[in-house]
């Protein structure tokens, strides 16, 4: 017997029908929700990350790197205007 007296062993949990009924619904649902979150662009909007087609512009074809840590805000403004 493992753990505290009132704990069920993990082997009992993963071999139960109830576990698989619940998880056969929740695991695919989480996968689909994550896929929709990224594919609709909502993840980019919420976290402020540039979309894959916004990393490089017509004028700037090199990677937008911040090189001066003390003037980082100015560099970000300059890179976002290009």
From Swiss-Prot:
Its cofactor is heme b. It holds the Pfam family Cytochrom_B559. It is a single-pass membrane protein. The chain crosses the membrane at residues 21-35. Its main location: plastid. The keyword Thylakoid applies. This is Cytochrome b559 subunit alpha. It comes from the Eukaryota. It is found in: Plastid, Chloroplast thylakoid membrane. This b-type cytochrome is tightly associated with the reaction center of photosystem II (PSII). PSII is a light-driven water:plastoquinone oxidoreductase that uses light energy to abstract electrons from H(2)O, generating O(2) and a proton gradient subsequently used for ATP formation. It consists of a core antenna complex that captures photons, and an electron transfer chain that converts photonic excitation into a charge separation. SUPFAM superfamilies: Cytochrome b559 subunits. GO terms for cellular component: chloroplast thylakoid membrane; photosystem II reaction center. With its partner (PsbF) binds heme. PSII binds additional chlorophylls, carotenoids and specific lipids. NCBIfam families: cyt_b559_alpha (TIGR01332). The keyword Transport applies. GO terms for biological process: photosynthetic electron transport chain. Keywords: Chloroplast, Electron transport, Heme, Iron, Membrane, Metal-binding, Photosynthesis, Photosystem II, Plastid, Thylakoid, Transmembrane, Transmembrane helix, Transport. Heme binds at residue 23. Heterodimer of an alpha subunit and a beta subunit. PSII is composed of 1 copy each of membrane proteins PsbA, PsbB, PsbC, PsbD, PsbE, PsbF, PsbH, PsbI, PsbJ, PsbK, PsbL, PsbM, PsbT, PsbX, PsbY, PsbZ, Psb30/Ycf12, at least 3 peripheral proteins of the oxygen-evolving complex and a large number of cofactors. It forms dimeric complexes. Belongs to the PsbE/PsbF family. GO terms for molecular function: electron transfer activity; heme binding; iron ion binding.
């Amino acid at each position: 017997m493992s753990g505290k007296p009132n704990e069920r062993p993990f082997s009992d949990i993963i071999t139960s029908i109830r576990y698989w009924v619940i998880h056969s619904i929740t695991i695919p649902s989480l996968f689909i929700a994550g896929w929709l979150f990224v594919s609709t662009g909502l993840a980019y909007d919420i976290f402020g990350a540039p979309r894959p087609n916004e990393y490089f512009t017509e004028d700037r074809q090199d990677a937008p790197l911040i090189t001066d840590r003390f003037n980082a805000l100015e560099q970000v403004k300059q890179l976002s205007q290009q």
